[in-house]
C-alpha cells in the first residue's frame, strides 16, 4: 500500500443499484427511495498523504471543478473539525469509475476519505456518525461508509445489510451524461411505488428502476445501450444512469457478453463484492 513519495493508496469501489424504487417526494424536495446497493470491484484509487499544517490540498480535481467543490475535498474539510490535532492531507484521485454513470464514483471517493482520515486524524467518529456526515455530501456516500451490500431507504441513508448471491456484471456506458436533477424533476417520473414489506433479494424480484423509463425517453443513447445489452439477458439501468448492466452467475458467461458489447460501447467486466475492501485493511 505504501509508495515511494509517502502517499498511501486506498480503494474506492463502485456500486450498482440492482433495484431502485421511488416511494415518494419529501417536503425538502428530495425523494424517498428503496434500493438494493451492491459493491463491485471496479474501483478508483484514492492516494492520501498526511500533513501537519492543517491544509487540505486536492491535486487533481475531477472535471476541472474548483477543489472546494469536489466531494473528496469537502469530505476532508467536513471531518477536519473533529481532528484531535491540527491535521491536513493531500489527496490525489486515480479515476477508473466513469463519471455521470450511476456508479457512485465521486461518492465512493468521498467515503474512502472519511473512513481513512477518521483513523489518521483520531476523530473517533462511529460508523453511524460518519454515515450522518456522509449524507450531507450526497445520497450515495452513506452506503460506501456502511461498507456492505445493503437495502437502502430514506434518501439512501437508512441501510440494512443484505445477502446478495455472488455474481459477475457486464456494465455498458453509453456516450451521454444524464442529469440527475433533470430526471428527479421530470413530470413523468414514477414517485409512488409501494414500500417493501419484506425486502429480501428474492422478494424484490423482478428488479426494476423507476427512473429508467424517463431516462430512456430523454436520452435515446441510453435506450440503445439497454436494448443491445438486453439481447444477452435481463438488463437494467443503475442509479439515474447512464450505465446499464446485466448480471451473470459466472465469469465466463459475463466475459462472453463483455466481448460482444465492448466493441460497440465503453464496457466493464466487474465482480460483485460482499464488503468494502477497506473493511479488510
Curated annotation (Swiss-Prot):
Its EC number is 2.7.1.148. GO terms for molecular function: 4-(cytidine 5'-diphospho)-2-C-methyl-D-erythritol kinase activity; ATP binding. ATP binds at residues 98-108. It comes from Neisseria meningitidis serogroup C (strain 053442). The lineage of its organism: Bacteria, Pseudomonadati, Pseudomonadota, Betaproteobacteria, Neisseriales. Catalyzes the phosphorylation of the position 2 hydroxy group of 4-diphosphocytidyl-2C-methyl-D-erythritol. The keyword ATP-binding applies. Gene3D superfamilies: 3.30.230.10, GHMP kinase, C-terminal domain. Pathway: Isoprenoid biosynthesis; isopentenyl diphosphate biosynthesis via DXP pathway; isopentenyl diphosphate from 1-deoxy-D-xylulose 5-phosphate: step 3/6. Keywords: ATP-binding, Isoprene biosynthesis, Kinase, Nucleotide-binding, Transferase. It catalyses: 4-CDP-2-C-methyl-D-erythritol + ATP = 4-CDP-2-C-methyl-D-erythritol 2-phosphate + ADP + H(+). The active site is at residues 15, 140. One of its GO terms (biological process) is terpenoid biosynthetic process. This is 4-diphosphocytidyl-2-C-methyl-D-erythritol kinase. Disulfide bonds: none annotated. Belongs to the GHMP kinase family. IspE subfamily. Pfam families: GHMP_kinases_C (PF08544), GHMP_kinases_N (PF00288).
Amino acid at each position: 500500500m505504501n509508495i515511494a513519495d509517502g502517499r498511501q493508496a486506498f480503494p474506492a469501489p463502485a456500486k450498482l443499484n440492482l433495484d431502485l424504487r421511488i416511494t415518494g417526494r419529501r417536503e425538502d424536495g428530495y425523494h424517498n427511495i428503496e434500493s438494493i446497493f451492491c459493491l463491485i470491484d471496479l474501483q478508483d484509487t484514492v492516494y492520501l498523504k498526511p500533513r501537519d499544517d492543517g491544509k487540505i490540498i486536492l491535486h487533481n480535481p475531477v472535471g476541472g471543478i474548483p477543489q472546494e467543490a469536489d466531494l473528496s475535498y469537502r469530505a476532508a474539510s467536513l471531518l477536519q473539525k473533529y481532528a484531535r490535532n491540527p491535521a491536513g492531507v493531500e489527496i490525489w484521485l486515480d479515476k477508473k469509475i466513469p463519471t455521470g454513470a450511476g456508479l457512485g464514483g465521486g461518492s465512493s471517493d468521498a467515503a474512502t476519505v472519511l473512513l481513512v482520515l477518521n483513523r489518521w486524524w483520531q476523530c473517533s467518529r462511529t460508523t453511524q456518525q460518519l454515515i450522518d456526515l456522509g449524507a450531507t455530501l450526497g445520497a450515495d456516500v452513506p452506503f460506501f461508509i456502511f461498507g456492505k451490500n445493503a437495502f437502502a431507504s430514506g434518501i439512501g441513508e437508512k441501510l440494512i445489510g443484505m445477502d446478495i448471491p455472488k455474481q459477475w456484471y457486464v456494465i455498458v456506458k453509453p456516450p451521454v451524461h444524464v442529469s440527475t436533477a433533470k430526471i428527479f424533476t421530470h413530470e413523468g417520473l414514477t414517485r409512488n411505488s409501494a414500500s417493501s414489506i419484506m425486502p429480501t433479494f428474492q422478494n424484490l424480484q423482478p428488479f426494476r428502476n423507476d427512473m429508467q423509463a424517463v431516462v430512456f425517453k430523454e436520452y435515446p443513447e441510453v435506450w440503445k445501450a439497454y436494448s443491445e445489452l438486453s439481447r444477452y439477458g435481463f438488463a437494467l439501468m443503475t442509479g439515474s444512469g447512464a450505465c446499464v448492466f446485466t448480471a451473470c452467475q459466472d465469469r465466463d458467461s459475463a466475459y462472453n457478453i463483455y466481448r460482444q458489447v465492448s466493441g460497440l460501447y465503453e464496457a466493464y467486466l466487474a465482480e460483485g463484492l460482499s464488503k468494502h475492501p477497506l473493511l479488510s485493511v
